[in-house]
């Protein structure tokens, strides 16, 4: 009976390891930012290039560019709600709350007066 318990434990550990490996393989993300509050993101891609392409394709504003790559974390973007074509900030962090706070602080640092988080996204870890 003890041997069966060990077999189940080994099988369970193997499944957990497989899930972790698959999760790590899908941990690429990207954030693209454009003018007047435009943004796009792509998360949970196997390849960074695919995440970048998804972020760019979802960014509907002009002059979009990928500003950051996420690996098992979160990205946030804040804009001045009264002037979305003015100040903005973005951040990438392993924790959503920190990414949001940093993006807000950067928006205020660049002259925003009424900054709000416009977008956020986390990959499978976040």
Where are these regions (language model features)?
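Bacterial N-terminal signal peptides that target proteins for export
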Residues: 1-12
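Secreted/extracellular ectodomain signature
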Residues: 2, 24-126
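Bacterial N-terminal signal peptides
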Residues: 11-20
């Amino acid at each position: 009976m003890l041997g069966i318990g060990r077999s189940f434990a080994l099988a369970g550990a193997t499944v957990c390891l497989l899930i972790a490996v698959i999760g790590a393989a899908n941990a690429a993300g990207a954030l693209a930012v454009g003018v007047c509050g435009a943004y796009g993101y792509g998360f949970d891609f196997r390849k960074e290039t695919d995440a970048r392409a998804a972020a760019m394709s979802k960014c509907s504003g002009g002059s979009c560019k990928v500003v950051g790559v996420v690996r098992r974390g979160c990205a946030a973007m804040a804009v001045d709600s009264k002037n979305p074509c003015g100040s903005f900030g973005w951040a990438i962090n392993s924790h959503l709350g920190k990414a949001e706070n940093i993006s807000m602080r950067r928006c205020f640092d660049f002259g925003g007066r009424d900054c709000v988080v416009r977008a956020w996204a986390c990959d499978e870890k976040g």
